[in-house]
């Protein structure tokens, strides 16, 4: 495809509804906040948040190629993939082994396509049973990424007992954060290797 600005990096952020900022009255979500704090004077970005409510890793396996193929130019180094992993696998009862395999398959294919990938793990909810699964899932996702040298932002452990996160969830539906919660995720991403992954100076 064409039509972009000269020298821009195109970033597809594929995941669940959190990548689209559901629950944020400002409509920025964590993706918009990260982009707003990313220097673009010398390296412009075109960022495409592509969220589906309750998305699972199986859904991502089926979807990510189609989403990226329609938005990326076939120019080496000009495209990036971000995976925003959510609670979908836990709610759908997907086994930990299958979740690991699904993520591994995406990362391996992206690597074969020379497509740099950045992974953001699932944040906690207010439901203890769901959090039990998310705690294990986040650790598993982190391990899969670590084995492949892919940057992984753990959103679960830093927020599990974070007062501002829990207060923000409590003010909403208990699952989707508001402005404060998305700001916390954005902070974790920005301090989790984001600039280095894009090749930008902080």
Where is each model-derived feature located?
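Serine-esterase "nucleophile elbow" of acetyl-processing enzymes
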Residues: 1-53, 58, 65-75
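Structural motif
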Residues: 10, 79-82, 116
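Short, solvent-exposed loop/turn segments at secondary-structure boundaries
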Residues: 22-27, 93-97, 128-133
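Cell-envelope and extracellular/periplasmic
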Residues: 50-55, 83-90
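Glycine-rich anion/phosphate-binding loops
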Residues: 58-65, 94-104
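Glycine-rich phosphate-binding loop signature in dinucleotide/nucleotide-binding domains
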Residues: 70-78, 113-114, 196-198
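Active-site segments of SGNH/GDSL-like serine hydrolases
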Residues: 84-88, 106-138, 162
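Catalytic His-Asp segment of secreted/periplasmic serine-dependent ester chemistry enzymes
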Residues: 124-202
């Amino acid at each position: 495809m064409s039509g972009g600005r000269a020298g821009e990096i195109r970033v597809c952020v594929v995941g669940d509804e959190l990548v689209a900022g559901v629950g944020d009255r400002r409509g920025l979500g964590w993706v918009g906040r990260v982009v707003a704090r990313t220097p673009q004077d010398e390296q412009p970005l075109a960022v495409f948040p592509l969220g589906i409510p309750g998305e699972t890793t199986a859904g991502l396996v089926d979807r990510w190629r189609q989403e990226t193929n329609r938005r990326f130019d076939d120019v080496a180094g000009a495209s990036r993939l971000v995976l925003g992993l959510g609670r979908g696998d836990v709610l759908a009862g997907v086994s930990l082994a299958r979740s690991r395999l699904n993520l591994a398959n995406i990362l391996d294919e992206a690597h074969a396509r020379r497509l740099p990938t950045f992974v953001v793990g699932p944040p906690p909810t207010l439901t203890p049973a769901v959090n039990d699964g998310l705690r294990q899932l986040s650790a598993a996702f982190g391990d899969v990424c670590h084995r492949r040298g892919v940057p992984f932002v753990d959103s679960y452990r830093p927020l599990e007992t974070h007062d501002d996160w829990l207060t923000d969830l409590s003010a909403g539906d208990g699952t989707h954060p508001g402005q404060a919660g998305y700001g916390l995720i954005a902070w974790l991403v920005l301090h989790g290797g984001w600039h280095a992954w894009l090749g930008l100076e902080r």
